[in-house]
């Protein structure tokens, strides 16, 4: 088998025996096939391997050309938040529930992975979002998001008054529990649950979805991914926060605003050649079967 990848990182958070077996089987299979393998520290401790090459996520990003993430979409998102800063490709073996991103089936994972490792794969460059909390155009706090940036309050079901500017032009004002700003990758997640549209992964688009708006006319808004979004708040607003992929939370203080824009970094996600985005949607969302 011709090696299109030479150094492979194994990433995951095994929480049950079947996941541990998948990690160990993958590790032994890669070693047997002559690959240099780095395995994340926490995974190596769980597997109790004999003198493996261990590494942090950052080291895997620096030294490996492919990372195999074993787990659900949450595990892949967590790993990708670090690995997206490096020139490394990522593929996922699903050990979670949905598996929109981690799409390899554990039962056929090694067969499909063998095809990928021989160069028979497709590459998707999924763009990220930069979220910046600013005070007079000076960045106070920032983070990235692969799925979505969510404006919300510290307390549940508290209304927020805010204004949305797109490319320095006033777009709309809103009284709502919050706002979801989603990438195409995130459009099948939290955004979809809030009534947002599904955006094909290849589109250069961002969707803004109000959360429980205090009006009947509020609708999701789809804009070009090159647009810069600014959220402004009245001075009476308190306890405001933005959440990036439900993993990083940034506090918004009095007098601060939020800028959200397309990041210069990408999630380099790869799939077997047989991967079909719309077939995945049909399967995961239980859409109707073909009539003929």
From Swiss-Prot:
Keywords tagged on the record: ATP-binding, Cytoplasm, Kinase, NAD, NADP, Nucleotide-binding, Transferase
Gene Ontology terms: cellular component: cytoplasm
InterPro entries per the UniProt record, alphabetical: ATP-NAD_kinase_N (IPR017438), ATP-NAD_kinase_PpnK-typ_C (IPR017437), NAD/diacylglycerol_kinase_sf (IPR016064), NADK (IPR002504)
Active-site residues, Swiss-Prot/TrEMBL: 73
Positions contributing to NAD(+) binding: 73-74, 147-148, 158, 175, 177, 188-193, 247
Principal EC category: transferase
Localization of this protein: Cytoplasm
Necessary cofactors: a divalent metal cation
Biological processes per GO annotation: NAD metabolic process; NADP biosynthetic process
Cross-referenced Gene3D superfamilies: Probable inorganic polyphosphate/atp-NAD kinase, domain 1, Probable inorganic polyphosphate/atp-NAD kinase, domain 2
Superkingdom field: Bacteria
Protein family (similarity comment): Belongs to the NAD kinase family.
Function: Involved in the regulation of the intracellular balance of NAD and NADP, and is a key enzyme in the biosynthesis of NADP. Catalyzes specifically the phosphorylation on 2'-hydroxyl of the adenosine moiety of NAD to yield NADP.
Protein name in the entry: NAD kinase
Originating organism: Buchnera aphidicola subsp. Acyrthosiphon pisum (strain APS)
Taxonomic lineage from the root: Bacteria, Pseudomonadati, Pseudomonadota, Gammaproteobacteria, Enterobacterales
Gene that produces this protein: nadK
